[in-house]
Amino acid sequence: MSGLSRALQLTDIDDFITPSQMCIKPVKIDKAKSKTGAKIMIKDDSCFEESESGKKKLNKVEITLQDCLACSGCITSAEGVLITQQSQEELLRVLQENLTKKATEDWGNVRTIVFTIATQPLLSLAHRYQIGVEDSARHLAGYFRSLGADYVLSTKVADDIALLECRQEFVERYRENENLTMLSSSCPGWVCYAEKTHGNFILPYISTTRSPQQIMGVLVKHVFAEKLNVPASQIYHVTVMPCYDKKLEASREDFFSTANNSRDVDCVITSVEVEQLLSESQRTLAQYDPVDLDWPWSNVPPDFMVWAHEKTLSGGYAEHIFKFAAKELFNEVPRSELEFKQLKNRDFREIILKKNGNTVLKFAIANGFRNIQNLVHKLKRGKVSNYHFVEVMACPSGCINGGAQIRPTTGQHVRELTRKLEELYHNLPQSDPENSLTKLIYTDFLDGFQTEKSYELLHTRYHDVVSELSKSLNINW
């Protein structure tokens, strides 16, 4: 298991969603079907035997990342799979190999190393090392530069674009009364669960807008590569994320470009993995020289590199889209800070806009697997069709409490840690997605807003894994 990230091996990695203990890999077995399925005994040598009608030695099972994506045995426990290309060991290997090629002047094989850092890991690292959030970004950039990074970026522009695309998609669906309730798509744990468990029933409701990570992948491998005049395959793009499931998302075939022979995101490391790397370096984050983050999208960078998007903690989808839709569809301007009403628990909240006594917009935020299950079951029974949009995140409290965020210190409760991270987030400057820098990317690189090119690069599709599984034998390990 040397290829598995050490952070995944050594910690409790349930990422707040209770995984099924039944991993299913479709294996064709020529035997009669039974009502109970085949029982498998795992042996010490990692082989297993089928023991229903006499013992039968089977081959060793090798589970790749693609097997995991095509499987519905677990829900989101990507972290339990051997993801050899998504570990800090692999990252360090690539960085060292690249430094060696530079030292030997093997310029034809030198890769451009680009890091992209999401906001939530910066909050986690800032709290862990007791420094400011913007400072944590600059010190982290310095650390990555010391490892051999050529560029270090923030996800700000991708966060902005994701909101612009998602809100426009919602307004179009609302006007056409098509595929509502619309469900957010930025959480890979939620998308993986939907594909594996509910298939074609739920998939049309999910927004086609790519997550900020994958939008950033497009910008780096298409836009930035063009600016640098290097092939996309020659760029090694690393993202720093709050969630192990982002590793699975980056590995989807939808995000591999056959034209460029390159993935949009080559490697994902997480907050807790960065902490582990820093621990192994025997230095704290603040001990690395601070370096400004790069801003390759225009000549003038923004005043800050780390921004909040509304007051909600997972990208601000529900809040931002609600405000935009109220103005765009009904010429209503809600208060700058919306108040969501808590329902059965703090992770399920809703907000309503009424006009002439009628409810014209009804949005919700559903965080945590329990609320996701309830939401889907109600959708199937037709009981939540009055919700127009739901922001769905797999982790309780959303991405700020992601399964790969740095763990609480001894004696500190998860709720207390989450509250402190929320305070850090709420003190960040607020980003307006309709800023001139974002508009510049649309005009200069995407042929404008709502163009064929922008849709091709900024949207994705989903797959009914359930129907594929119905063709295979259900095996309990």
UniProtKB/Swiss-Prot annotation:
Transmembrane segments: none annotated. Signal peptide: none annotated. The keyword Nuclease does not apply. [4Fe-4S] cluster 1 binds at residues 23, 68, 71, 74. SMART domains: Fe_hyd_SSU. GO terms for biological process: iron-sulfur cluster assembly. It comes from the Eukaryota. [4Fe-4S] cluster 2 binds at residues 187, 243, 395, 399. Gene3D superfamilies: 3.40.50.1780, Fe-only Hydrogenase (Larger Subunit), Chain L, domain 3. Keywords: 4Fe-4S, Iron, Iron-sulfur, Metal-binding. GO terms for molecular function: 4 iron, 4 sulfur cluster binding; metal ion binding. PANTHER family: NITRATE, FORMATE, IRON DEHYDROGENASE. Belongs to the NARF family. Component of the cytosolic iron-sulfur (Fe/S) protein assembly machinery. Required for maturation of extramitochondrial Fe/S proteins. This is Probable cytosolic Fe-S cluster assembly factor GG21400.
